């Protein structure tokens, strides 16, 4: 598993064999996502829909240029930008295996970070179910010191089912 974070920089060789698939989300935006990540997402999405929760991908793969644009936008308007967005070259989104979710709630799609933070009950269910499809919550609540980022309930990382279950079991052992 490739780790990209504030200490581990991305390079193009990391994705030379990655197959990105095209997907049009609820806004008809073109999203690119790594093939296995997308397949797992579609299964998670279908399972959650049965439980009354509708999710979609707000953001997937990001080029260095796209990440730079997002980073500069945060830099201009948020004093805590370094705890909310990765610098270009240090984002898991460069791998295509991380997705940011939008959630349909009370008749509308929610994608703003502030509003998503208030969706406590839907995210409890999403976080419980995602493990079974190979996703982990990369920036959990209470782990800001370790991750270097604020809690981001919408940011999922696909690691495969074996690894997601091992991570879940390891967390449970340490409680």
Predicted stretch roles:
Residues 1-175:
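Extracytoplasmic cell-surface/polysaccharide-interacting catalytic and binding patches
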